[in-house]
A protein has these predicted regions:
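Gly/Ser-rich "nucleophile elbow"/oxyanion-hole loop immediately N-terminal to the catalytic nucleophile
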Residues: 146-161
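Gly/Ala-rich beta-loop-alpha elbow adjacent to hydrolase catalytic centers
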Residues: 163, 167, 171
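Short beta-strand element of the alpha/beta-hydrolase
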Residues: 82-92
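Short beta-strand-to-loop junctions in surface cap/lid or active-site-entrance loops
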Residues: 69-83, 247-252
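Short amphipathic alpha-helix adjacent to the substrate-entry channel of hydrolases
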Residues: 101-120
Length: 322
C-alpha cells in the first residue's frame, strides 16, 4: 500500500493550500520568512486579556542579555491560594523562527484549557544567535521560575518543560543541562512534541514518505547549519554538544518522566523513535504516541481533525497531572 496522508488530514490540508507550492528555501532566513507567514495563518489568536492575562518578566541569560519570559494565566489561576504547577513552553521554528508574540495564541490556549500558568521563553534565534543561545536562554528561564517561585505562586517541584519541533529539542537540551548542573529541585516533567533532536538525520532521497513531509531534509539541513555551524552540522565525527543535538547525549539517565509524540510521516519520526528507545533503556518513564498518516505540525495544518484531537487530549491530560 502506498504511503499516503490520513484521509481526514488530507481533506483539511487541501483547504488551506492555494496556488503553487513555495520553492524550496535556500537560506535560514527564507525559512524564517516562510514560517512566520504560515504561523500567522494557522496559529490561533490569543483571547482577550480578561480571559487569559499576560504578564512579562525579564530574565538575564548566561551572557548578560535580557530575555523576555511571558506568563499566560486565567484569573482563576491567578487567584489561587496554593502554589500552582507551571509549564515552561519553548516554541518551535527550526531554531531560526518563531517568537512569543507569534505563538501567543497557542500558549494562551494551553493556559485556558488546562488551568495552569504557562511561561513562554522568547529565546534568541539562529543564525544571528547560534548555539548555545537558545538552550541557555531556556535554562535561565527555568532557573528564574525556581528562584521566583514564591512571588509567582508556583510549585518549583512541579515544573514541566514543554516544546515542539525545534522547541522540543531545546526542551530536551534544557532538561539535560538541568540534570548535569544539578538544578534543584529537578524538572518534574518533560514534554517533547515531534522534537528535532539529531543534526545527523539523513534519509535516502527516494524514501517514499519524504514526498509527504512538510518539514523537508532541505529545511532541516539549513536549520542545523544555522544553529550549530556549517562545519559541524550533519557530520558524525564533529563535536556537537548534546545540549544542542540531544541525540548525541551519552545517556538519558536521570531525566524526568517524559512524553513524546510524532506522526508517521514526520521527518523526525526515526530519531524520535530512537530517543524513546534510549529513554526506556535508561529507565526513564515514557509515554509515547505515534500518530498515523500525519506529518510535521499536523495539528496546525489540520486543526480539529481526529488525530489533532487525540494528540491534544493526550498532551493536556499529561499537563494536568504535573
Amino acid at each position: 500500500m502506498p504511503v499516503q496522508y490520513d484521509t481526514e488530514f488530507a481533506e483539511a490540508l487541501a483547504l488551506i493550500k492555494s496556488g503553487r507550492p513555495p520553492a524550496p528555501p535556500e537560506t535560514a532566513l527564507e525559512i524564517r520568512h516562510n514560517n512566520h507567514a504560515l504561523f500567522l495563518k494557522v496559529f490561533p489568536k490569543a483571547p482577550s486579556l480578561d480571559i487569559v492575562e499576560q504578564t512579562d518578566y525579564t530574565v538575564e541569560s548566561y551572557d548578560g542579555v535580557q530575555i523576555l519570559l511571558r506568563r499566560y494565566a486565567t484569573p482563576k489561576v491567578l487567584r489561587a491560594k496554593e502554589p500552582q504547577p507551571a509549564i515552561l513552553v519553548i516554541h518551535g521554528g527550526g531554531f531560526v523562527s518563531g517568537t512569543v508574540e507569534i505563538c501567543g495564541g497557542t500558549n494562551a490556549a494551553i493556559a485556558l484549557e488546562i488551568e495552569r500558568p504557562v511561561f513562554a521563553v522568547d529565546y534568541r534565534l539562529a543564525p544571528e544567535h547560534p548555539y548555545p543561545a537558545a538552550v541557555e536562554d531556556s535554562f535561565a528561564s527555568l532557573e528564574y521560575l525556581i528562584d521566583h517561585a514564591k512571588e509567582l505562586n508556583i510549585d518549583p517541584c512541579r515544573i514541566c518543560v514543554k516544546g515542539n519541533s525545534a522547541g522540543g529539542g531545546i526542551a530536551v537540551g534544557t532538561v539535560l543541562m538541568a540534570r548535569d548542573r544539578e538544578l534543584n529541585p529537578p524538572v518534574a516533567k518533560l514534554m517533547a512534541i515531534y522534537p528535532e533532536l539529531d543534526d545527523r538525520t539523513c534519509h535516502p532521497p527516494d524514501t517514499e514518505f519524504l514526498k509527504l513531509a512538510t518539514w523537508t531534509s532541505q529545511h532541516n539541513q539549513l536549520a542545523w547549519k544555522a544553529y550549530v555551524g556549517e562545519d559541524k552540522a550533519g557530520k558524525p565525527d564533529a563535536v556537537v554538544s548534546p545540549y544542542a543535538a540531544p541525540a548525541r547525549a551519552q545517556n538519558y539517565n536521570g531525566l524526568p518522566s517524559t512524553y513524546v509524540d510524532v506522526g508517521t510521516l514526520d521527518l523526525f519520526r526515526d530519531e524520535d523513535l530512537e530517543f524513546v528507545r534510549r529513554l526506556l533503556e535508561d529507565d526513564v518513564e515514557v509515554e509515547f504516541h505515534l500518530w498515523p498518516g500525519v506529518p510535521h505540525v499536523f495539528e496546525f495544518l489540520a486543526p480539529g481533525t481526529r488525530w489533532h484531537q487525540r494528540a491534544k487530549e493526550a498532551q493536556n491530560d499529561v499537563l494536568r497531572r504535573v
